[in-house]
């Protein structure tokens, strides 16, 4: 299977949060699954850290190193993702999450998310 991590999942992974369900951890760590992180999630984390709205127990460099040394693939924003973004109904106000939905649709990925607004879209998701 092919999965896209929502930003909160990345944060919960790096922070080893007890909020992360064990079955979701298993999906992410299962070697036959391909797990992707969208570059927009990294931008969202950087912005929130810069504004003081997010504090992690690791630095941003350590977060990047964790991602690079794990088995995650980074998806850059592509033209097709932006086209899908423009086609989305305005269910969710958060532009970062809307771009994650568009990316998942364009790349045929299942989003791992607890976000009920993302779950309202016509996109595969799991939690």
Region roles according to the model:
Residues 57, 69-114:
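Active-site neighborhoods of divalent-metal-dependent phosphate/nucleic-acid chemistry enzymes
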Residues 6-8, 45, 85, 104:
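Generic structural signal for small/hydrophobic residues in well-ordered secondary structure
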Residues 1-37, 53-65, 107, 116, ...:
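Short, well-structured N-terminal submotif of metal-dependent ribonuclease cores
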Residues 9, 41-42, 81, 100, ...:
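Alpha-helix capping/helix-boundary segments
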Residues 119, 124-127:
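Basic, glycine-rich
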């Amino acid at each position: 299977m092919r999965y896209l991590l929502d930003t909160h999942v990345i944060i919960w992974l790096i922070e080893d949060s007890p909020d992360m369900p064990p079955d979701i951890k298993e999906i992410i760590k299962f070697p036959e699954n391909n797990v992707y992180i969208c570059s927009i999630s990294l931008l969202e984390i950087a912005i929130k850290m810069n504004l003081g709205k997010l504090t992690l127990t690791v630095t941003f460099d350590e977060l990047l190193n964790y991602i690079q040394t794990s088995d995650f693939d980074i998806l850059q924003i592509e033209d097709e993702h932006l086209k899908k973004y423009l086609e989305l109904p305005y269910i969710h106000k958060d532009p970062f999450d809307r771009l994650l939905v568009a990316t998942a649709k364009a790349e045929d990925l299942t989003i791992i998310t607890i976000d009920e607004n993302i779950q309202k879209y016509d996109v595969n998701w799991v939690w």
